[in-house]
Amino acid sequence: WLGIPPARQEGSVPFIRAVIAQRNYKSAEEIVEIEKACDVTADMHITAMKVLRPGMYEYEVVAEMNRVAESNNCQLSFATIAPINGQTLHNHYHGNKVKPGDLFLIDAGAEVESGYAGDMSSTIPADKKFTTRQREVYEIQNAMHLESVKALRPGIPYMDVYELSARVMV
């Protein structure tokens, strides 16, 4: 970069501090934008929960979610992940037909004009209710999440929170 080999480049402490300040501290206007992105993202997921039913295709649910983003003058934060085959990470194929008993994984978000974006994941039972086994797994995952959130605070290494979550699982 600029003809300087990477091994000879030095970091600029003032520049690094300026970037950190921009990322860590938000104005009231920025907070409003962040909240709008999160609100529209939540509405996208709630819409999916309302419309999902056996017999639909994944792309029909995605279209309804996209409509929510677009009707709020938002773009998608990223390509929506919305498969019944959630075991395949980052699956962007939306052509499967939803069957009774399926779980529908959603990872989607809305981006407002200012560039702030939401990113949320949900797992929704196609039949509106979890089976007994699905509920058991959901409750384990939820306990892992809640314990991890309680443990998060400045200075706590990520690995400590990860290990706490793993202990809750087992």
Predicted features and spans:
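Active-site neighborhoods and metal-handling regions in enzymes and metal-associated proteins
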Residues: 1-170
